[in-house]
Amino acid sequence: LRPKRESGARRALHEFLAVPLAIILGFVLLAVVTSVLDGLDVGWLQPVVRALAKVAPPSENQSMLRTVAPGMLSLLSITFVLLLTLVHRMADVFTWVVVEQFLQRRDNQAFFGYFAGLSSYFVVVLTLVDPDQAVFSTVAALVSSVAALVALVVFGYLVLDQLRPPSVVERIVQLTIATRADQVKWLRRVRDEPVLTELPGTPVQAECSGYLVDIDLDTLGRALGTARGAAEIEFRIRLGSHMVAGSDLATVRAEDPGDRERLADAVLDALRCGRERQLDREPRYGVHQLSSMGWASATQRDPEAALVTVDGLHTLLAYWTQKRTPAADSDDNADRLPVVYRDTTIPEVLSALANIAVGAIEGGQHQTCARVLHVFAMTIPRLSPEDQRMASAQVRHALPTVTRHPFTMELDRALTELSRVLSDYGHNDIAAELDRIEEGLKHQLPGR
Protein backbone atom coordinates (compact mmCIF):
# COMPACT_ATOMS: atom_id res chain seq x y z
CA LEU A 1 0.00 0.00 0.00
CA ARG A 2 1.17 3.50 -0.82
CA PRO A 3 2.17 6.05 0.35
CA LYS A 4 4.65 3.96 2.27
CA ARG A 5 4.06 3.99 6.01
CA GLU A 6 6.89 5.22 8.22
CA SER A 7 8.44 2.58 10.47
CA GLY A 8 7.08 2.74 14.01
CA ALA A 9 10.35 1.42 15.44
CA ARG A 10 12.38 4.05 13.60
CA ARG A 11 10.03 6.77 14.79
CA ALA A 12 10.26 5.54 18.40
CA LEU A 13 14.06 5.57 18.25
CA HIS A 14 14.10 9.07 16.78
CA GLU A 15 11.53 10.47 19.19
CA PHE A 16 12.72 8.99 22.49
CA LEU A 17 14.41 5.59 22.69
CA ALA A 18 17.76 6.20 20.96
CA VAL A 19 19.40 8.24 23.75
CA PRO A 20 18.21 6.08 26.71
CA LEU A 21 19.18 2.84 24.96
CA ALA A 22 22.64 4.20 24.13
CA ILE A 23 23.21 5.22 27.76
CA ILE A 24 21.96 1.85 29.05
CA LEU A 25 24.36 0.11 26.68
CA GLY A 26 27.16 2.31 28.01
CA PHE A 27 26.43 1.26 31.60
CA VAL A 28 26.34 -2.41 30.60
CA LEU A 29 29.74 -2.00 28.95
CA LEU A 30 31.01 -0.24 32.09
CA ALA A 31 29.81 -3.17 34.18
CA VAL A 32 31.63 -5.61 31.92
CA VAL A 33 34.83 -3.54 32.01
CA THR A 34 34.83 -3.18 35.81
CA SER A 35 34.05 -6.89 36.18
CA VAL A 36 37.04 -7.78 34.00
CA LEU A 37 39.28 -5.42 35.98
CA ASP A 38 38.11 -6.99 39.25
CA GLY A 39 39.04 -10.43 37.92
CA LEU A 40 42.54 -9.46 36.76
CA ASP A 41 45.53 -10.34 38.88
CA VAL A 42 48.41 -8.37 37.38
CA GLY A 43 51.16 -6.61 39.24
CA TRP A 44 50.83 -3.13 37.77
CA LEU A 45 47.15 -3.02 38.78
CA GLN A 46 47.66 -3.91 42.44
CA PRO A 47 48.55 -0.38 43.68
CA VAL A 48 45.30 0.89 42.20
CA VAL A 49 43.36 -1.99 43.78
CA ARG A 50 44.87 -1.30 47.21
CA ALA A 51 44.06 2.42 46.93
CA LEU A 52 40.45 1.74 45.92
CA ALA A 53 40.10 -0.93 48.62
CA LYS A 54 40.36 1.82 51.23
CA VAL A 55 37.14 3.28 49.80
CA ALA A 56 35.45 -0.05 49.12
CA PRO A 57 36.91 -2.75 51.42
CA PRO A 58 36.44 -6.21 49.83
CA SER A 59 35.00 -7.57 53.09
CA GLU A 60 32.15 -5.03 52.92
CA ASN A 61 31.52 -5.02 49.19
CA GLN A 62 28.86 -7.74 49.12
CA SER A 63 26.67 -6.13 51.77
CA MET A 64 27.30 -2.69 50.28
CA LEU A 65 26.19 -3.70 46.78
CA ARG A 66 23.19 -5.65 48.01
CA THR A 67 22.10 -2.71 50.17
CA VAL A 68 22.72 0.15 47.76
CA ALA A 69 21.23 -1.53 44.69
CA PRO A 70 17.69 -2.21 46.04
CA GLY A 71 17.61 1.18 47.77
CA MET A 72 18.51 3.03 44.58
CA LEU A 73 16.00 1.04 42.53
CA SER A 74 13.20 1.75 45.02
CA LEU A 75 14.02 5.45 45.21
CA LEU A 76 14.17 5.83 41.44
CA SER A 77 10.94 3.89 40.94
CA ILE A 78 8.99 5.99 43.45
CA THR A 79 10.36 9.24 42.05
CA PHE A 80 9.57 8.28 38.48
CA VAL A 81 6.01 7.32 39.38
CA LEU A 82 5.46 10.68 41.07
CA LEU A 83 6.96 12.66 38.20
CA LEU A 84 5.02 10.78 35.53
CA THR A 85 1.82 11.21 37.53
CA LEU A 86 2.49 14.95 37.60
CA VAL A 87 3.13 15.02 33.85
CA HIS A 88 -0.10 13.11 33.24
CA ARG A 89 -2.00 15.52 35.45
CA MET A 90 -0.67 18.50 33.53
CA ALA A 91 -1.64 16.75 30.29
CA ASP A 92 -5.22 16.63 31.54
CA VAL A 93 -5.13 20.41 31.92
CA PHE A 94 -3.06 21.44 28.89
CA THR A 95 -3.76 18.51 26.49
CA TRP A 96 -1.38 15.75 25.42
CA VAL A 97 1.07 18.35 24.09
CA VAL A 98 2.75 18.38 27.51
CA VAL A 99 3.59 14.67 27.34
CA GLU A 100 4.82 14.94 23.77
CA GLN A 101 7.18 17.78 24.63
CA PHE A 102 8.34 15.92 27.75
CA LEU A 103 9.32 12.86 25.71
CA GLN A 104 11.12 14.81 23.00
CA ARG A 105 13.47 16.77 25.27
CA ARG A 106 17.00 15.38 25.07
CA ASP A 107 17.79 16.12 28.71
CA ASN A 108 14.77 14.06 29.84
CA GLN A 109 15.88 11.21 27.61
CA ALA A 110 19.37 11.38 29.09
CA PHE A 111 18.05 11.25 32.67
CA PHE A 112 15.80 8.30 31.89
CA GLY A 113 18.72 6.51 30.27
CA TYR A 114 21.05 7.25 33.18
CA PHE A 115 18.70 5.94 35.84
CA ALA A 116 17.77 2.84 33.83
CA GLY A 117 21.44 2.30 32.94
CA LEU A 118 22.50 2.51 36.59
CA SER A 119 19.90 -0.11 37.48
CA SER A 120 21.24 -2.33 34.70
CA TYR A 121 24.76 -1.80 36.01
CA PHE A 122 23.80 -3.09 39.46
CA VAL A 123 22.11 -6.16 37.96
CA VAL A 124 25.12 -7.05 35.79
CA VAL A 125 27.66 -6.49 38.57
CA LEU A 126 25.74 -8.56 41.12
CA THR A 127 25.48 -11.34 38.55
CA LEU A 128 29.06 -11.42 37.23
CA VAL A 129 31.40 -10.26 39.98
CA ASP A 130 32.72 -12.16 42.99
CA PRO A 131 31.83 -9.86 45.94
CA ASP A 132 35.22 -10.49 47.55
CA GLN A 133 36.94 -9.03 44.47
CA ALA A 134 34.44 -6.31 43.49
CA VAL A 135 36.68 -3.30 44.11
CA PHE A 136 36.42 -1.48 40.78
CA SER A 137 32.73 -2.40 40.43
CA THR A 138 31.85 -1.18 43.91
CA VAL A 139 33.68 2.14 43.53
CA ALA A 140 32.02 2.74 40.16
CA ALA A 141 28.64 1.88 41.73
CA LEU A 142 29.18 4.31 44.61
CA VAL A 143 30.26 7.17 42.33
CA SER A 144 27.37 6.52 39.94
CA SER A 145 24.89 6.35 42.83
CA VAL A 146 26.00 9.69 44.25
CA ALA A 147 25.76 11.20 40.77
CA ALA A 148 22.27 9.67 40.41
CA LEU A 149 21.09 11.32 43.63
CA VAL A 150 22.33 14.69 42.40
CA ALA A 151 20.79 14.06 38.98
CA LEU A 152 17.50 13.15 40.64
CA VAL A 153 17.27 16.59 42.25
CA VAL A 154 18.17 18.30 38.97
CA PHE A 155 15.71 16.14 37.03
CA GLY A 156 12.91 16.90 39.47
CA TYR A 157 13.48 20.64 39.05
CA LEU A 158 13.66 20.37 35.27
CA VAL A 159 10.39 18.44 35.11
CA LEU A 160 8.60 21.04 37.23
CA ASP A 161 10.11 23.84 35.14
CA GLN A 162 9.14 22.15 31.88
CA LEU A 163 5.52 21.88 33.01
CA ARG A 164 5.15 25.62 33.45
CA PRO A 165 3.02 27.04 30.62
CA PRO A 166 5.74 29.53 29.53
CA SER A 167 8.27 26.68 29.21
CA VAL A 168 5.90 24.49 27.19
CA VAL A 169 4.94 27.35 24.88
CA GLU A 170 8.53 28.56 24.45
CA ARG A 171 9.68 25.07 23.50
CA ILE A 172 6.92 24.67 20.92
CA VAL A 173 7.62 28.12 19.47
CA GLN A 174 11.36 27.40 19.16
CA LEU A 175 10.80 24.05 17.44
CA THR A 176 8.14 25.51 15.15
CA ILE A 177 10.39 28.37 14.06
CA ALA A 178 13.26 25.97 13.36
CA THR A 179 11.01 23.65 11.35
CA ARG A 180 9.57 26.58 9.43
CA ALA A 181 13.08 27.75 8.51
CA ASP A 182 13.76 24.35 6.94
CA GLN A 183 10.38 24.35 5.22
CA VAL A 184 10.98 27.78 3.67
CA LYS A 185 13.97 26.35 1.77
CA TRP A 186 11.68 23.54 0.60
CA LEU A 187 8.93 25.98 -0.46
CA ARG A 188 11.37 27.97 -2.60
CA ARG A 189 11.65 24.91 -4.84
CA VAL A 190 7.92 24.67 -5.63
CA ARG A 191 5.11 26.81 -7.06
CA ASP A 192 2.12 28.12 -5.16
CA GLU A 193 -0.22 28.22 -8.18
CA PRO A 194 -0.64 25.88 -11.19
CA VAL A 195 0.36 27.11 -14.66
CA LEU A 196 -0.55 24.10 -16.84
CA THR A 197 -4.25 23.83 -16.06
CA GLU A 198 -5.09 23.33 -19.75
CA LEU A 199 -3.34 19.93 -19.82
CA PRO A 200 -5.23 16.68 -19.10
CA GLY A 201 -5.07 15.69 -15.44
CA THR A 202 -5.07 12.39 -13.57
CA PRO A 203 -5.94 12.26 -9.86
CA VAL A 204 -3.61 10.43 -7.47
CA GLN A 205 -5.41 8.69 -4.61
CA ALA A 206 -4.14 7.23 -1.36
CA GLU A 207 -4.14 3.48 -0.81
CA CYS A 208 -3.73 3.64 2.98
CA SER A 209 -4.63 5.84 5.93
CA GLY A 210 -2.49 8.06 8.14
CA TYR A 211 -0.99 11.53 8.33
CA LEU A 212 1.18 12.90 5.55
CA VAL A 213 4.59 13.37 7.18
CA ASP A 214 7.02 13.83 4.29
CA ILE A 215 7.23 14.76 0.60
CA ASP A 216 10.44 13.86 -1.23
CA LEU A 217 10.93 16.60 -3.83
CA ASP A 218 14.03 14.91 -5.25
CA THR A 219 11.98 11.86 -6.23
CA LEU A 220 9.39 14.10 -7.89
CA GLY A 221 12.10 16.12 -9.65
CA ARG A 222 13.65 13.00 -11.18
CA ALA A 223 10.26 11.77 -12.36
CA LEU A 224 9.37 15.14 -13.88
CA GLY A 225 12.73 15.23 -15.64
CA THR A 226 11.86 12.05 -17.57
CA ALA A 227 8.53 13.40 -18.87
CA ARG A 228 8.35 13.69 -22.68
CA GLY A 229 6.63 17.06 -22.60
CA ALA A 230 5.39 19.71 -20.20
CA ALA A 231 4.13 18.26 -16.93
CA GLU A 232 2.97 19.48 -13.53
CA ILE A 233 2.03 17.99 -10.16
CA GLU A 234 -0.50 19.84 -8.00
CA PHE A 235 -0.90 18.65 -4.41
CA ARG A 236 -4.40 18.61 -2.95
CA ILE A 237 -3.25 17.96 0.62
CA ARG A 238 -0.54 19.42 2.81
CA LEU A 239 1.96 18.06 5.28
CA GLY A 240 0.05 17.01 8.37
CA SER A 241 -3.19 16.31 6.50
CA HIS A 242 -4.98 13.08 7.33
CA MET A 243 -5.58 10.70 4.45
CA VAL A 244 -7.72 7.60 4.05
CA ALA A 245 -7.92 5.08 1.25
CA GLY A 246 -9.33 6.89 -1.76
CA SER A 247 -8.38 10.41 -0.62
CA ASP A 248 -7.19 12.72 -3.40
CA LEU A 249 -3.50 13.42 -2.84
CA ALA A 250 -2.54 15.25 -6.01
CA THR A 251 -3.35 15.85 -9.66
CA VAL A 252 -0.71 15.13 -12.30
CA ARG A 253 -0.97 16.98 -15.61
CA ALA A 254 0.75 15.96 -18.82
CA GLU A 255 -0.23 15.53 -22.46
CA ASP A 256 1.03 11.96 -22.68
CA PRO A 257 -1.02 9.31 -20.76
CA GLY A 258 2.15 7.34 -20.08
CA ASP A 259 3.76 10.37 -18.45
CA ARG A 260 0.70 10.84 -16.25
CA GLU A 261 0.83 7.22 -15.12
CA ARG A 262 4.55 7.40 -14.30
CA LEU A 263 4.14 10.68 -12.44
CA ALA A 264 1.23 9.28 -10.43
CA ASP A 265 3.44 6.37 -9.34
CA ALA A 266 6.23 8.82 -8.49
CA VAL A 267 3.89 10.85 -6.29
CA LEU A 268 2.92 7.77 -4.29
CA ASP A 269 6.59 6.79 -3.96
CA ALA A 270 7.59 10.30 -2.83
CA LEU A 271 5.08 10.52 0.02
CA ARG A 272 5.36 9.07 3.51
CA CYS A 273 2.54 8.65 5.97
CA GLY A 274 2.61 8.01 9.71
CA ARG A 275 0.29 7.45 12.62
CA GLU A 276 0.84 10.98 13.98
CA ARG A 277 1.95 14.41 12.87
CA GLN A 278 5.58 15.42 13.39
CA LEU A 279 6.69 18.85 14.56
CA ASP A 280 10.22 18.42 13.23
CA ARG A 281 8.83 18.26 9.66
CA GLU A 282 5.69 20.37 9.76
CA PRO A 283 5.40 23.82 11.40
CA ARG A 284 1.60 23.72 11.12
CA TYR A 285 1.64 21.02 13.79
CA GLY A 286 3.35 23.42 16.20
CA VAL A 287 0.57 25.92 15.51
CA HIS A 288 -1.98 23.16 16.11
CA GLN A 289 -0.34 22.30 19.43
CA LEU A 290 -0.47 25.91 20.57
CA SER A 291 -4.07 26.17 19.41
CA SER A 292 -5.05 23.04 21.35
CA MET A 293 -3.24 24.20 24.46
CA GLY A 294 -4.73 27.68 24.17
CA TRP A 295 -8.26 26.34 23.71
CA ALA A 296 -7.95 24.00 26.69
CA SER A 297 -6.50 26.79 28.84
CA ALA A 298 -9.08 29.34 27.72
CA THR A 299 -11.90 27.13 28.98
CA GLN A 300 -10.36 27.05 32.47
CA ARG A 301 -10.75 29.67 35.18
CA ASP A 302 -7.09 30.69 35.26
CA PRO A 303 -6.20 32.83 32.20
CA GLU A 304 -2.40 32.64 32.64
CA ALA A 305 -1.74 29.68 30.32
CA ALA A 306 -4.11 30.98 27.64
CA LEU A 307 -2.42 34.39 27.66
CA VAL A 308 1.01 32.79 27.34
CA THR A 309 -0.22 30.70 24.41
CA VAL A 310 -1.63 33.76 22.63
CA ASP A 311 1.75 35.47 23.12
CA GLY A 312 3.44 32.41 21.59
CA LEU A 313 1.24 32.60 18.50
CA HIS A 314 1.98 36.32 18.29
CA THR A 315 5.70 35.52 18.36
CA LEU A 316 5.28 33.16 15.41
CA LEU A 317 3.37 35.75 13.40
CA ALA A 318 5.91 38.48 14.16
CA TYR A 319 8.83 36.25 13.19
CA TRP A 320 7.30 34.89 10.01
CA THR A 321 5.99 38.20 8.70
CA GLN A 322 9.53 39.56 8.97
CA LYS A 323 10.96 36.59 7.08
CA ARG A 324 8.21 36.07 4.51
CA THR A 325 8.57 33.35 1.88
CA PRO A 326 9.09 34.92 -1.56
CA ALA A 327 6.11 34.46 -3.85
CA ALA A 328 6.52 32.36 -6.96
CA ASP A 329 6.25 35.02 -9.68
CA SER A 330 6.56 34.45 -13.40
CA ASP A 331 10.24 35.40 -13.45
CA ASP A 332 11.43 32.62 -11.16
CA ASN A 333 8.91 29.89 -12.04
CA ALA A 334 11.48 28.47 -14.44
CA ASP A 335 13.84 27.83 -11.52
CA ARG A 336 11.17 26.00 -9.51
CA LEU A 337 9.98 22.45 -9.86
CA PRO A 338 6.62 22.13 -11.64
CA VAL A 339 5.13 21.07 -8.31
CA VAL A 340 2.27 23.07 -6.79
CA TYR A 341 2.05 23.20 -3.00
CA ARG A 342 -0.06 25.82 -1.22
CA ASP A 343 1.31 26.95 2.12
CA THR A 344 -1.28 27.86 4.76
CA THR A 345 0.89 28.27 7.83
CA ILE A 346 0.09 31.94 8.55
CA PRO A 347 -3.68 31.46 8.02
CA GLU A 348 -3.46 28.56 10.49
CA VAL A 349 -2.03 30.91 13.13
CA LEU A 350 -4.80 33.44 12.51
CA SER A 351 -7.39 30.68 12.83
CA ALA A 352 -5.78 29.47 16.08
CA LEU A 353 -6.06 32.95 17.59
CA ALA A 354 -9.75 33.18 16.69
CA ASN A 355 -10.37 29.72 18.14
CA ILE A 356 -8.82 30.73 21.46
CA ALA A 357 -11.02 33.83 21.55
CA VAL A 358 -14.07 31.60 21.10
CA GLY A 359 -12.87 29.21 23.81
CA ALA A 360 -12.43 32.11 26.23
CA ILE A 361 -16.23 32.34 26.51
CA GLU A 362 -16.35 29.05 28.43
CA GLY A 363 -13.79 30.23 30.97
CA GLY A 364 -15.08 33.79 31.17
CA GLN A 365 -11.62 35.05 30.24
CA HIS A 366 -12.16 38.61 29.03
CA GLN A 367 -8.38 39.11 29.37
CA THR A 368 -7.70 36.39 26.80
CA CYS A 369 -10.28 37.79 24.37
CA ALA A 370 -8.76 41.26 24.69
CA ARG A 371 -5.24 39.88 24.14
CA VAL A 372 -6.34 38.09 20.96
CA LEU A 373 -7.89 41.29 19.58
CA HIS A 374 -4.71 43.18 20.49
CA VAL A 375 -2.57 40.63 18.62
CA PHE A 376 -4.75 41.01 15.53
CA ALA A 377 -4.35 44.79 15.74
CA MET A 378 -0.56 44.49 16.07
CA THR A 379 -0.22 41.94 13.27
CA ILE A 380 -2.56 43.11 10.50
CA PRO A 381 -0.25 45.96 9.33
CA ARG A 382 2.56 43.44 8.78
CA LEU A 383 0.52 40.91 6.79
CA SER A 384 0.22 40.59 3.03
CA PRO A 385 -3.07 41.82 1.51
CA GLU A 386 -4.30 38.24 1.16
CA ASP A 387 -3.46 37.40 4.77
CA GLN A 388 -5.04 40.68 5.90
CA ARG A 389 -8.31 39.54 4.32
CA MET A 390 -7.95 36.24 6.14
CA ALA A 391 -7.30 38.04 9.43
CA SER A 392 -10.33 40.28 8.98
CA ALA A 393 -12.47 37.21 8.26
CA GLN A 394 -11.23 35.55 11.46
CA VAL A 395 -12.02 38.72 13.41
CA ARG A 396 -15.53 38.72 11.97
CA HIS A 397 -16.09 35.14 13.15
CA ALA A 398 -14.77 35.96 16.63
CA LEU A 399 -16.81 39.13 17.09
CA PRO A 400 -19.94 37.46 18.53
CA THR A 401 -17.84 36.22 21.45
CA VAL A 402 -16.91 39.76 22.50
CA THR A 403 -20.44 40.58 23.65
CA ARG A 404 -20.35 37.62 26.05
CA HIS A 405 -17.60 39.17 28.19
CA PRO A 406 -17.76 41.97 30.76
CA PHE A 407 -16.77 45.28 29.18
CA THR A 408 -13.44 45.99 30.86
CA MET A 409 -10.97 48.77 30.11
CA GLU A 410 -8.64 46.20 28.58
CA LEU A 411 -11.34 44.99 26.20
CA ASP A 412 -12.34 48.58 25.39
CA ARG A 413 -8.77 49.48 24.39
CA ALA A 414 -8.40 46.34 22.28
CA LEU A 415 -11.65 47.02 20.39
CA THR A 416 -10.70 50.64 19.75
CA GLU A 417 -7.21 49.74 18.55
CA LEU A 418 -8.39 46.94 16.26
CA SER A 419 -11.16 49.10 14.78
CA ARG A 420 -8.65 51.83 13.94
CA VAL A 421 -6.23 49.39 12.29
CA LEU A 422 -8.96 47.73 10.22
CA SER A 423 -10.20 51.12 9.08
CA ASP A 424 -6.69 52.26 8.15
CA TYR A 425 -6.17 49.19 5.95
CA GLY A 426 -9.48 49.37 4.11
CA HIS A 427 -11.62 46.91 6.07
CA ASN A 428 -14.23 49.53 6.90
CA ASP A 429 -17.19 47.15 7.17
CA ILE A 430 -15.62 45.11 9.97
CA ALA A 431 -14.29 48.27 11.63
CA ALA A 432 -17.82 49.69 11.66
CA GLU A 433 -19.12 46.45 13.13
CA LEU A 434 -16.52 46.65 15.89
CA ASP A 435 -17.58 50.23 16.63
CA ARG A 436 -21.22 49.15 16.92
CA ILE A 437 -20.29 46.36 19.33
CA GLU A 438 -18.17 48.72 21.41
CA GLU A 439 -20.99 51.28 21.61
CA GLY A 440 -23.46 48.57 22.60
CA LEU A 441 -21.17 47.38 25.38
CA LYS A 442 -20.66 50.92 26.62
CA HIS A 443 -24.42 51.41 26.93
CA GLN A 444 -24.53 48.42 29.27
CA LEU A 445 -22.28 50.19 31.77
CA PRO A 446 -23.94 51.76 34.84
CA GLY A 447 -24.80 55.42 34.38
CA ARG A 448 -25.11 55.24 30.58
Where are these regions (language model features)?
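Transmembrane alpha-helix detector for multi-pass membrane proteins
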Residues: 29-42, 55-129, 149-156, 294
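Membrane-interfacial helical/loop segments at transmembrane boundaries in membrane proteins
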Residues: 44-54
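Hydrophobic alpha-helical transmembrane segments of small proteolipidic membrane proteins, enriched
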Residues: 10-11, 15-44
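Hydrophobic or amphipathic alpha-helical targeting/insertion segments
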Residues: 142-149
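Membrane-interface segments at loop-to-transmembrane junctions
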Residues: 5-23, 52-70, 94-113, 133-141, ...
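Short basic (Lys/Arg) and small-residue
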Residues: 1-5, 10, 135-138, 153-239, ...
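A short glycine/small-residue-enriched secondary-structure motif
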Residues: 47, 91, 268-269
